[in-house]
Amino acid sequence: MCGILALMLADPHQQACPEIYEGLYSLQHRGQDAAGIVTAGNKGRLYQCKGSGMVADVFSQHQLRQLVGSMGIGHLRYPTAGSCAHSEAQPFYVNSPYGLVLGHNGNLINGPELRRFLDTEAHRHVNTGSDSELLLNIFAYELQRLDKFRINENDIFEALRNVYDRVNGGYACVAMIAGLGVLGFRDPNGIRPLVIGERDTPEGKDYMLASESVVLTQFGYRTFRDIRPGECVFIRRSNREDILAGFRGPRLFSRQILPCLRFTPDIFEYVYFARPDSVIDGLSVYQSRLNMGEKLAHTIMKRFGPDYMEKIDAVIPVPDSARTSALALAQTAQLPYVEAFIKNRYIGRTFIMPGQQIRRKSVRRKLNVQPQEFFDKNVLIVDDSIVRGTTSREIVQMARESGAKNVYLASCAPMITHPHVYGIDLADCKDLIAYGKTEDEVAEAISADGVIYQTLEDLLDSCRTAELTEFEVGLFTGEYTTGASKEYLVHLEQMRIANNRARKHSFAEDEEREAPEDISLHNTHSDVTFDFV
């Protein structure tokens, strides 16, 4: 899972970089492994800065000042099953044709097939194991096949039609063509989210594309909508013909490249990944989590029986993503709600940290307890999900160390028994704590007195609207929207093993080693001075 963002300002003399930079801060929860920004100057030159780490670590004020131009794209990487190399920081760039950059959120399930095609037929070199580089080169190949000196919006849509025919998976992308404009597109099942907004200015309309609506509202984009599954939007920089025709500012073009196939957004966005103040595909993430808490409350009351209030002294959330659901659960069941875990806000989200050992250590760094809220009490701890069990074991142990009599754990999500194939590095089946186990066996594995899972039907009901009736739930059922062959799942596991092996070297003796310098063209990590054009 990653965060993506694209911006086109109406005023060609304004700089897009500051807003992209701040926007990435708002999406930081979507990826903490690497960050990158690429902008385009008015004469078409691209300026890039990217590297490993969080937004605050990657960009200095000196580097930001060199990212000039009124349009650009940004990316935050979440470590998936691919390599952890510094070279895989996005956006990716190819010079031919036209100068293209692309940032991608998701996963392609026919990656090995695409890699062979690019090698044997398209004769394009792919330098990393990233699906994003595959997508970029497929797009570049299809544009190259048009064999045009200059392209327009119709050419872009035609090329993307062929891209859709070749790739399979869940993806949302933003891209930029040097000197021409920015675009965004989404897979035909709508698995990964993408939203577009517009903002009125004296020079015309500014446009922004982002993974979540929270970025748009932060910057005053009052009119926004979700990109439809299979749709592409292209925002062209204003040119001389536009000015002569009386148009002001960038021009927006939209086309439904493919008809929507099923419209199955990934339900894990609502469970965990997205910010609660975002709206995805018309559904408030906050409201969906309230619904999850209410549904889970009824399951718990049924599980514990009529005297459940005598068996549970306090409902305690695991901050932050479980807070909303835990509060709704407590209110529905008329149980005391207590903030007994105190979060260190300077530690990243443990779920998306690269490596099991790092996650385990980070739980204790991230959370501390209020002992008086546990001592001599029966506590119900509410978490958004239970994946590997790393966090769950630690928080149960912390509760017991603080004197809790009985510790029960409730999950807002059902049992996760299968890998996620669309860009979230959950784990292989054998590493998922619920794989092949009952609720009682999971409770024993994490040393809890009981574990209560949300039912799949209740989770679906929590997120359904008039427009949203189906969701991607393969991690619970093993049935994926696009299908996933056994060969691909084996390939995914092999990539994850190689990735974990690389990370063991990277984090030897608990110290993160400095990554090699990125020597990509125009990378502002150096002290080279660029022309501000």
Swiss-Prot record:
A Gene Ontology molecular function term of the record: metal ion binding
Pathway: Purine metabolism; IMP biosynthesis via de novo pathway; N(1)-(5-phospho-D-ribosyl)glycinamide from 5-phospho-alpha-D-ribose 1-diphosphate: step 1/2
Required cofactor(s): Mg(2+)
Modified residues (Phosphoserine): S506
Keyword Transferase carried by entry: yes
Glutamine amidotransferase type-2 domain residues: 2-238
Enzyme Commission number(s): 2.4.2.14
Top-level EC class as recorded in UniProt: transferase
Keyword RNA-binding appears in the UniProt entry: no
Catalytic activity: 5-phospho-beta-D-ribosylamine + L-glutamate + diphosphate = 5-phospho-alpha-D-ribose 1-diphosphate + L-glutamine + H2O
CDD domains: GPATase_N, PRTases_typeI
Family matches, as InterPro entries: GATase_2_dom, Ntn_hydrolases_N, PRibTrfase_dom, PRTase-like, PurF, PurF_N
Binding note for cofactor: Binds 1 Mg(2+) ion per subunit.
GO BP terms, alphabetized: 'de novo' IMP biosynthetic process; adenine metabolic process; purine nucleobase biosynthetic process; purine nucleotide biosynthetic process
Ligand binding (Mg(2+)): D383, D384
Active site: C2
GO cellular component, one term: cytoplasm
Top-level division of the source organism's lineage: Eukaryota
Coiled-coil intervals: none
Keywords associated with the record: Glutamine amidotransferase, Glycosyltransferase, Magnesium, Metal-binding, Phosphoprotein, Purine biosynthesis, Transferase
Family (UniProt): In the C-terminal section; belongs to the purine/pyrimidine phosphoribosyltransferase family.
Name recorded for this polypeptide: Amidophosphoribosyltransferase
Protein species of origin: Schizosaccharomyces pombe (strain 972 / ATCC 24843) (Fission yeast)
Gene name tied to this protein: ade4
